[in-house]
Amino acid sequence: MESKLSLLLSLLCFITCFHTSFSASGETNPFKSVPDLEKSMYKDIEGFPCVRLLNLTGEIGCSNPGREKVVAPIVRFKSSKELTESAAILVSVDEFESVLSRVSKDSDFASKVAGIFVESRSQVQNGLDGFSPDVKFPQAEFAPYTSNNFQWNPAQGSGIMWKAYNFPVFLLSETSTSIVQQAARASENSKMSYTKVVSEFDLVMQTTKSGTHDSDSCLKEGTCLPLGGYSVWSALPPISLSSSPKPKPIVLAITSMDSASFFRDKSLGAESPISGLIAMLAVVDALSNVDGLTELNKQLVFLVLTGEAWGYLGSRRFFEEFDQQSDAIKGLNLTAIEMVMEIGSVGMSFSQGTKTFFAHTAGDTTSVNETLSALYSAQDSMSENVMVRKASTSNPGVPPSSLMTFLTKKPEISGVVLEDFDSTFSNKFYHSHLDGLSNINSSSIVAAASLVARTLYIQAGGSDPLALNSININASLVEELLGCLLDCEPGLSCELVQRYISPSTTCPNHYVGVILGEPSTARYPIYAGDISRFVWNFLADKTALPSTNASSSCPKHCNGDNELCIRQEAVEKGVCVISSTR
């Protein structure tokens, strides 16, 4: 299912590599060719760019001031308090926000900033109180309540990712940080000489033609592309598409798979939201092993959304699919959705030895109380120290979440968002490049997944205590997913991902992509990103029933109702299964 809305748009025309030029200083070197000379003068530096985005009201992010490349000497921030000439400033992460704050307030200083390099170093999170470039109430304009001055992200939310900067900004890799630090020192030491070490931003990071400053105009002119991607839903057990009795009420479990960051290619989002995604995949895996799900009086449906970090694109598109009666939601009945349970940030739940989660609720009191009762029953059935608490009544409503879209589009719906925080984010690095693997704990995710899996079973009508107690989360699967989705080693080259798809890259990144062309009606999202294709295959596999065409050529002879071809990228021929996965 494709998320395509014209809320926030971007032409990702940027470069992730730039040159640092070193002038000769009296040394004579024999050069046999022009490439030899160039190699002695330039060092290629790896960086992760801040890119330009446009919305209906204007521009945010970074771009060059014009269409010429930028060349400027490199200086450290501490020595650049009063810039006498245009310079590229090298800053540490803890200095970064103050530099951008000065740029916003001091026009003379801003006019001399040619670019900014941000250092990387290992374990930098340990020395920071926090770093979040998002605002104090992320996406407040989509809240279904009026208290949008509430601060869910109070201490760290600087809002710098929502401003426009007319100079390039790059996050350096750790290796490149050392090189640029040396260059900055060389610039300092050469103040009295004619030699300079300069940075050269080798390509113009310009997103739109002159005069195009919002998403509406650039879309009409074809000079930008809409943000978006493929969301995935699946039902357990599969929903029959043939004539059948009245459809069962639906218990809908949702989570999201995309994050955001100041730097596009450094958006892991480990705590927010990938901990929830991993918990969801583990939940589906656990419930797929439970017998008797077809006899339950409610239908379990799982929805993994993309584009949620940018205006809830995925969940808004989900409702648009219903308005259009699209094939993407064939088998689903919007009016049948009785309860929504969202898995939010669940990777940091430890409190005095107990894993504590908070249930943020909205909607009909009776339905909410039934869900809370199911959560408490699930909690009591677990042997480990896990606690569920109802979120504070002083909160204005649910925290930033996909449930906000559901409450706006279908106000009568009831829902619960499970989080590891009550009134303020636990995540000090929300929507930051620092929200990585070290920011979360696998046992917290396992506990959340156990809680949700058992709660969903109870909500769907399961009452067998033996079946309930048999629902256990595969902790090894959670660990494997952490390595696959939040690290470069093994990253997407891990055995689990390779079992389903042939990824285009090894290092995962969860920043939403762009949409090329019209949404596809194909059953398999072949042009979707690596994460969406993996999630689609995983859910289709775990929720599947065997097909009578299992031994047939796939996908050629896999075209019956609810028949899907999974693993077609990973093996010579895929496997045909019956699954309600789109």
Predicted regions and their residues:
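Secretory-pathway/membrane protein signature
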Residues: 1-582
